[in-house]
């Protein structure tokens, strides 16, 4: 089925939120520096050891590499959001599945203690690293939205369902408003 103008506008709003959140330097561009700074912020917020902080930094640099963000490369937030919407909305089923699976790199970045689950403190550190305006209460609400079975942790499966909804969903959902905080 053809994507309607309102569905496209909603999807673009999600991608703009994502890109604005990733632009932690606030310069209007997405760059490798942003991903490195997210890792530094998470390490500080989560009080990671030097070793864990470096592991987290390396994982975020892998995300930057996956996105083609070599040192010195930057793309405007607006262009990144439009490109993401354009490419995601025309993906075939197999490509969508691969995109969702590739997002597990981000899961591994957020799972700083490497126990295979994202805890509330880990998710909160990530959310507040990309959204310093996100309060503790909002972070908890977002976490609880993603923790479908209410066991106090976000599993890889729960994360994949959320990513699929965020990247490909065309209708407003609670999940979309929890992944990077409220849509901007």
Curated annotation (Swiss-Prot):
Residues the entry annotates as binding Ca(2+) 2: 147, 149, 151, 153, 158
GO annotation, biological process: bioluminescence
Domain EF-hand per the UniProt entry, residue ranges: 10-45, 46-81, 98-133, 134-169
Any one GO MF annotation of this record: calcium ion binding
Binding site for Ca(2+) 1: 111, 113, 115, 117, 122
Annotated source species: Renilla reniformis
InterPro entries attached to this UniProt entry: EF-hand-dom_pair, EF_Hand_1_Ca_BS, EF_hand_dom
Keywords, sorted A to Z: Calcium, Luminescence, Metal-binding, Photoprotein, Repeat
Function: This Ca(2+)-dependent protein binds to luciferin. The luciferin of LBP is capable of reacting with luciferase and O(2) only when calcium is bound.
PROSITE patterns the record matches: EF_HAND_1, EF_HAND_2
Protein name in UniProt: Luciferin-binding protein
């Amino acid at each position: 089925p053809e994507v309607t103008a309102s569905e496209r506008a909603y999807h673009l709003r999600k991608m703009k939120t994502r890109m604005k959140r990733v632009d932690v330097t606030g310069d209007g561009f997405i760059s490798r520096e942003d991903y490195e700074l997210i890792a530094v912020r998470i390490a500080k917020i989560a009080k990671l050891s030097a070793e864990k902080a470096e592991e987290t930094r390396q994982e975020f640099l892998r995300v930057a590499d996956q996105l083609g963000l070599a040192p010195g490369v930057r793309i405007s937030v607006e262009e990144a959001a439009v490109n993401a919407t354009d490419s995601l909305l025309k993906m075939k089923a197999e490509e969508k599945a691969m995109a969702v699976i590739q997002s597990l790199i981000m899961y591994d970045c957020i799972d700083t203690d490497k126990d295979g689950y994202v805890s509330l403190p880990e998710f909160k550190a990530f959310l507040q690293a990309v959204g310093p305006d996100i309060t503790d209460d909002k972070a908890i609400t977002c976490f609880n939205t993603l923790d479908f079975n209410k066991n106090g942790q976000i599993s890889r499966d729960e994360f994949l369902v959320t990513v699929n909804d965020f990247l490909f969903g065309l209708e407003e959902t609670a999940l979309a408003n929890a992944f990077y905080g409220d849509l901007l």
